[in-house]
Amino acid sequence: MKKSILTHKIKFSAIFFWGIVFGSSFETDSTKKEIYFPATVTSSAGNEIDVAALAKAHIMIVITIKATWCPVCRQQLLRIKEQLGDFEKCNASFLVLSPGSNEAVHEVKFNTDFPFPFISDQNFSIAKKLGLILSPEEIMPAIVILNEDLSVKWIRKGRNILNFGDAELKDHLGCANWI
């Protein structure tokens, strides 16, 4: 009887562990419904960004952060910043989408020193289009690759301390070993 209880506890622990590691993330190819990113946006610094032109010149990757206070999201930006050399090989450019005021979002940019524009999605209009509203104050963390026409090519939703998604992004892009 005790062995049976122990076996069930071990099975439950394993399922619980894998649920934490992989349960908060999934990726999809955007083939079911066309979702388009806005052609122009305003950065947290107040600069207009021509996303349409960027998407024609680069592989556009949008990193969403849950909230300006999210430590895992900040860590994600630092992880990607450390790997920018790999992403430059495939001509990638980034935008960071966050809820919050321009000031709070710009502070995240300053604190992470991430060298790409940050966008404050104060009214959640972009997050809503992408299906990424987590709560009235939070956006679901995600990595989004845009096509040249600004439609969503690939999206990987979710992030946690054990599973950031940058490896999946690099695998999907397939350019880390380009010369």
Write out the residue ranges for each language-model feature:
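Bacterial N-terminal signal peptides that target proteins for export
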Residues: 3-13
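Bacterial N-terminal signal peptides
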Residues: 13-21
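N-terminal "domain-start" segment that seeds a small globular fold
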Residues: 24-53, 75
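Short active-site neighborhood of thiol/selenol oxidoreductases, capturing the structured segment around
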Residues: 54-80
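Structural microenvironment flanking redox-active thiols in thiol-disulfide oxidoreductases
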Residues: 75-113, 124-128
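Structural micro-motif
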Residues: 115-116, 134-144
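Thiol-/selenol-based redox modules, centered on thioredoxin-like
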Residues: 140-179
